[in-house]
Structure formats: C-alpha cells, structure tokens
Amino acid sequence: MLNEIKYVYAVYQERSFTKAAKKLFISQPALSNMVKKAEQEIGSPIFDRSTVPLTLTREGEFYIQTIKKIM
C-alpha cells in the first residue's frame, strides 16, 4: 500500500505516467498497474487519463489531499 501511495503521488506531481516512471526508476506499465491497483482499492479512478497533462478526478483530488495530510 505504501508503494501505491508513493507512485500515485509521483504521477500527480509529474502529471504524466511516463515522467513519473522515469523519476521512480520503474517501467511505465508497472507504474500504471500500481495506480490501477490503488484505484481498485478505493473503487474509483484517481486520474482522468483522457487529458494531457493528466488531471485528477473528484475522488482523486480527495485521495491526494489525504496523502498530503499523512506525508
């Protein structure tokens, strides 16, 4: 769960899966899978993947605010 939080936050900061994956030294598909796992756990998408750069969904905004509080 901790890695998922770290990965979601990196994608949020970079607004890009590719840039976040490079920053984290992992493959983009692995990062995408971890974010999908986090989304499954909360039951909702975190990112709107139809926009460039990525934007947060309403649930994603709440998730990121929660992460910021615990970091």
Role assignments for model-derived ranges:
Residues 39-56:
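A short LG(V/I)-centered, amphipathic sequence patch enriched
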Residues 1-3:
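Short, basic-rich loop-to-helix N-cap that marks the start of a DNA-contacting helix
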Residues 26, 55-58:
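A structural signal for alpha-helical segments
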Residues 5-12, 57, 64:
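Hydrophobic residues on short alpha-helical segments
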Residues 9-27:
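Short helix-boundary/capping micro-motifs
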Residues 5, 41-42, 63-71:
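Alpha-helical linker/hinge and terminal dimerization helices associated
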Residues 23-24, 35, 42, 63:
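Core residues of bacterial helix-turn-helix
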